[in-house]
Structure formats: structure tokens, C-alpha cells
């Protein structure tokens, strides 16, 4: 087994939230499914998003300089598949309801949370760009259950009925 395949297999065992990252601006509207998203700091609120420079959406995100990270809820598996494949952009966005945040990037109705961001710095790392994104607006939906990607499958999360014992 190659080192690359061993790494991919190991990473499949690292559970992660499923996100649809969207943008809209002078270069047009685009979106993709991502699990390579995480918090950097809360002062100021900053996320990082990893984007492959060979992805068809890369030039749009690069030119727009803004994005929204929409964390998917249980039940969004099909939508994740649309944004993770070769489906045309119009069909991707037609499959759900969207609103606009402060940057104008599409925010998914029913997302667990949406982080509307301005891209502040881009760091190239091998095949990807690491986008450091300043969070300008947060929209939460506390009535949803989470969705994670683990072992190459979706898993719905539910809230516990009671808190953890101390």
C-alpha cells in the first residue's frame, strides 16, 4: 500500500462535520462539499477551509474572496453528494433553499450553523490552498441534528436527552 493510500485510509477514521462551502460574487456562484474545515481562533473568529487548486470551483473562490461554511444537518446527505460531485452548479443550488448573509454568499436554510466569512489569507500547501477566513456572521439552527463523515459513510448525530454526569 502506498503512503498516500495509507494516509487516506487512516484519515477515513477521523470523524468530521460535513460542510457545503459556498460563494457568490463577481466571479459567480459556486459551492463544494468539504470536511477539511476547522476553527483557528475565536479572537477574532477565524476558520480554515482547505480547497484543492485543481477543483473546478477554485477560480471562483479565489476571485470572490468570500465564502460561507454551511455545516450540514442529518437529512442533508443527498445534498452533500450533489455538491461533492460533477453536478452542474445550477442543479446543486436548486436542490435546497438558500438565503444571503452579509457577504452575499449563499447560506443553507436548515444548516446546523452557517459561518459567513471573508477570506483574509491564502496559504498554499502542496495541492491545496488553506483559506484563513474571518467570520463576519454566524447563523445557528438549534433545532437540527448534526451529520458527520466517518469511515467513508455519513452518520447522523442526535442530541443527548440529558447532560453528562459530572
From Swiss-Prot:
Q: Per its record, what are the GO molecular function terms? A: FMN binding; FMN reductase (NADH) activity; FMN reductase [NAD(P)H] activity; riboflavin reductase (NADPH) activity
**InterPro entries documented for this protein:** Flavin_Rdtase-like_dom, NADH-dep_flavin_reductase, RutF, Split_barrel_FMN-bd
Chemical reaction(s) catalysed? FMNH2 + NAD(+) = FMN + NADH + 2 H(+)
Superkingdom to which the source organism belongs: Bacteria
* EC number assigned by the record: 1.5.1.42
Paired cysteines (S-S): none
Give the record's keywords alphabetically.
Answer: Flavoprotein, FMN, NAD, Oxidoreductase
What Pfam families does this protein's entry cite?
Flavin_Reduct
Example of a GO biological process term: nitrogen utilization
At the top of the EC hierarchy, this enzyme's class is: oxidoreductase
Q: Which family does it belong to?
A: Belongs to the non-flavoprotein flavin reductase family. RutF subfamily.
Per its database record, what is this protein's job?
Catalyzes the reduction of FMN to FMNH2 which is used to reduce pyrimidine by RutA via the Rut pathway.
User: Entry's NCBIfam families?
Assistant: RutF
Q: This chain belongs to which protein, by name? A: FMN reductase (NADH) RutF
Q: Which gene encodes it?
A: rutF
Amino acid at each position: 500500500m502506498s503512503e498516500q493510500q495509507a494516509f487516506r485510509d487512516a484519515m477515513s477514521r477521523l470523524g468530521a462535520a460535513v460542510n457545503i462551502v459556498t460563494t457568490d460574487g463577481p466571479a459567480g456562484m459556486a459551492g463544494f462539499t468539504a470536511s477539511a474545515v476547522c476553527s483557528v481562533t475565536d479572537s477574532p473568529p477565524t476558520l480554515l477551509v482547505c480547497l484543492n487548486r485543481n477543483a473546478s470551483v477554485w477560480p471562483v473562490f479565489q476571485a470572490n474572496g468570500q465564502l460561507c461554511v454551511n455545516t450540514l444537518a442529518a437529512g442533508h446527505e443527498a445534498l452533500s453528494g450533489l455538491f461533492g460531485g460533477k453536478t452542474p452548479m445550477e442543479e446543486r443550488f436548486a436542490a435546497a433553499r438558500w438565503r444571503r448573509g452579509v457577504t452575499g454568499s449563499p447560506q443553507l436554510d436548515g444548516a446546523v450553523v452557517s459561518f459567513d466569512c471573508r477570506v483574509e489569507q491564502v496559504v498554499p500547501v502542496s495541492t491545496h490552498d488553506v483559506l484563513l477566513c474571518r467570520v463576519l456572521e454566524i447563523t445557528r439552527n438549534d433545532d437540527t441534528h448534526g451529520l458527520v463523515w466517518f469511515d467513508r459513510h455519513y452518520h447522523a448525530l442526535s442530541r443527548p436527552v440529558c447532560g453528562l454526569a459530572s
